[in-house]
Amino acid sequence: MALTGYSWLLLSATFLNVGAEISITLEPAQPSEGDNVTLVVHGLSGELLAYSWYAGPTLSVSYLVASYIVSTGDETPGPAHTGREAVRPDGSLDIQGILPRHSGTYILQTFNRQLQTEVGYGHVQVHEILAQPTVLANSTALVERRDTLRLMCSSPSPTAEVRWFFNGGALPVALRLGLSPDGRVLARHGIRREEAGAYQCEVWNPVSVSRSEPINLTVYFGPERVAILQDSTTRTGCTIKVDFNTSLTLWCVSRSCPEPEYVWTFNGQALKNGQDHLNISSMTAAQEGTYTCIAKNTKTLLSGSASVVVKLSAAAVATMIVPVPTKPTEGQDVTLTVQGYPKDLLVYAWYRGPASEPNRLLSQLPSGTWIAGPAHTGREVGFPNCSLLVQKLNLTDTGRYTLKTVTVQGKTETLEVELQVAPLG
């Protein structure tokens, strides 16, 4: 009786299964998507009449891939045939361009001339070529110790293994503790500044690996350790001593991300300066006081401050006169700046020459009222701090100038300065 097609299946149901000698190996052993794969059969014995291959856990007709009659070479596809399978004369099964859906258990059933049947089992695991994953973040800018970081490795391959990278290396221990059981979600409560950087995830299987593009995380913090630094001047604790008519630059520094906004105050009054430094171009007694820098972080909504006291140096406290500029030329204005004038001043007077000659009086300032003297040319202006402005200098302004001061206690002091006016050209 000649049997073809599914009739072998009906016969196979009436005979006992014997011996488990058949073994099946896979070539290649770890196939990837698109490979040509062979389920190689070993241990066939006796003269066989037919083979049947099943792609499933049982010998159900619904799992039948194909039946093959040895004597004629006829192959009959079954319900589970995908168009890629072919049975070899030796019983092996070829699968062309294998796909992940071909993964699973395969059963070979053989029939001999005594109509006895044997079965062999094999397993196919097809590893797909992995697409590049993507890291998804709840936010890429977080506030330290306040916000939670949540990253997810998004991949169309649910069976792929996942590993994470931080700045190209392994995750720190604290971050590894926040991984989900499947490794696809990374959570970190109370993010730290040292955890700012580039994060990547990588998916892999035995035949393929793919890493995501980095996602960069910024962690905002501060301001902390706000301090005021200065250039080369004498400092004792929070007090800075400055020579008269010299310049001073104060720098406000802090640890902060992002860079904070700055506000400077002088003796409690806000200054029009939003920079990280403050320049005092020409130090006088009027600039003595407390300077405060306030640093404000617009992301963390935190702020910090530092203060210093700026004073004239001990050497500058003694009364002296300094021309500003020190080498004036014809046509310029010059200010005879008084350093260390008496705090209890009652009256002062400027003379063009010695104070012993009344006709040399330029101006005087008793009780806050400025009065011009006989030697006044209309170009001189006196100030409450004893300084004298001489405008539009000419060469005849060269010579001695004398300042006479009288305190409330009646103490009189006389100070002289020689003014040199350089000609133009």
From Swiss-Prot:
Keyword Signal assigned: yes
MF (Gene Ontology): identical protein binding
Keywords: Deafness, Disease variant, Disulfide bond, Glycoprotein, Immunoglobulin domain, Non-syndromic deafness, Repeat, Secreted, Signal
Entry's Gene Ontology BP terms: sensory perception of sound
Signal sequence, renumbered to the chain: 1-20
Annotated InterPro entries: CEA_cell_adhesion (IPR050831), Ig-like_dom (IPR007110), Ig-like_dom_sf (IPR036179), Ig-like_fold (IPR013783), Ig_sub (IPR003599), Ig_sub2 (IPR003598), Ig_V-set (IPR013106)
Effect after changing G169R: In DFNA4B; impairs homooligomerization of the protein; decreases secretion of the protein
Subcellular location: Secreted
This protein's GO CC annotations: extracellular space; stereocilium tip
Lineage: superkingdom: Eukaryota
Chief location bin: secreted
SMART domains assigned: IG, IGc2
Disulfide bonds: C153-C201, C252-C293
Keyword Ribonucleoprotein: no
Residue ranges constituting the Ig-like C2-type domain according to the UniProt record: 133-218, 223-309
A Pfam entry, by short name: Ig_2
Glycosites: N36, N216, N394
Its biological purpose: Required for proper hearing, plays a role in maintaining the integrity of the tectorial membrane.
Subunit structure: Homooligomer; can for homodimers and homotetramers. Interacts with TECTA and TECTB.
Disease entry from the Swiss-Prot or TrEMBL record: Deafness, autosomal dominant, 4B: A form of non-syndromic sensorineural hearing loss. Sensorineural deafness results from damage to the neural receptors of the inner ear, the nerve pathways to the brain, or the area of the brain that receives sound information.
Family from the record: Belongs to the immunoglobulin superfamily. CEA family.
Protein name: Cell adhesion molecule CEACAM16
